[in-house]
Amino acid sequence: MQINSIKIPLIELQNIKVVFGAKTALQNINLSIYPNTVITIVGPNGGGKSTLLKVLLKLLSPTDGKVIHHRDLRIGYVPQKIHLEQSLPITVEKFLSLKKGISKAEIQDAIELLSIKHLIHSSMQKLSGGEMQRVLLARALLNKPNLLVLDEPMQGVDLSGQIELYQLIHQTREKLNCAILMVSHDLHIVMADTNEVVCINRHICCAGSPEKVSNDPTFIHLFGDQFSQNVAFYTHHHNHQHNMHGDVCCIGNKHSVQCINNGR
């Protein structure tokens, strides 16, 4: 059976509570992720974002509450970072081929979609932050996900590189018709087609559209008024395109950042 109704959640968290010893990491978390939606989770360091992600992926069992995965759920996961042994270099091509049950044609499709053909013989250890994220995203797509989970995908990537990654994520979502759950430490740039931002600080502090959350008193208390006034939206209508190092590399489908409240 295919998941084709927006009324059926891909994942549902019901009254989740996680306790480590005497410390409550999460409590009263209720969250549903529907097909073809984009959800961004933000929150302060130590607020439980990583714990929530582990529970959602069933890598950690909650102390209380229920995690429901739809039977047809296919997750593509992009971790915040991976550890690579420096003494054992591995090429991008070899790294992608490590995933079992994947054909060369499927790897080639992912390489072309993420525009990383020029990197296939490069050492993983020598990739820039933006290049690494492209490769990790390509690997996640090999699972043909209907839910793409991105853990801090913009970490270590400069502003222009972030815009380029958002472009790729948007294109990926359109091609695969998948939902996206993105975990971030801030709201400086969010996808323009984000349906909901969820702010976590051990519990759900506030949730809603990016504009609503950035002006919520609880969010401002956590992140500061100046931060809340500098939320920008990636949009996918452009007049030029950057590479991962921020250089303008071609004219065609492009990107821009529309800033909210600060006139940038």
Swiss-Prot record:
Record InterPro entries: AAA+_ATPase, ABC_transporter-like_ATP-bd, ABC_transporter-like_CS, Metal_Ion_Import_ABC, P-loop_NTPase
Residues the record lists as binding ATP: 43-50
Keywords of this entry: ATP-binding, Cell inner membrane, Cell membrane, Ion transport, Membrane, Nucleotide-binding, Translocase, Transport, Zinc, Zinc transport
Subcellular location: Cell inner membrane
Catalytic activity as recorded in UniProt: Zn(2+)(out) + ATP(in) + H2O(in) = Zn(2+)(in) + ADP(in) + phosphate(in) + H(+)(in)
Lineage: superkingdom: Bacteria
UniProt topology in membrane: Peripheral membrane protein
Enzyme class: translocase
Any one Gene Ontology cellular component term annotated for this protein: plasma membrane
GO biological process terms on file: response to zinc ion
Any Pfam family hit: ABC_tran
Principal cellular location given in the protein's record: membrane
Molecular function as annotated in GO: ABC-type zinc transporter activity; ATP binding; ATP hydrolysis activity
Every ABC transporter domain range: 11-226
Family designation: Belongs to the ABC transporter superfamily. Zinc importer (TC 3.A.1.15.5) family.
Assembly behavior: The complex is composed of two ATP-binding proteins (ZnuC), two transmembrane proteins (ZnuB) and a solute-binding protein (ZnuA).
General function of this protein: Part of the ABC transporter complex ZnuABC involved in zinc import. Responsible for energy coupling to the transport system.
Record's protein name: Zinc import ATP-binding protein ZnuC
UniProt source species: Mannheimia succiniciproducens (strain KCTC 0769BP / MBEL55E)
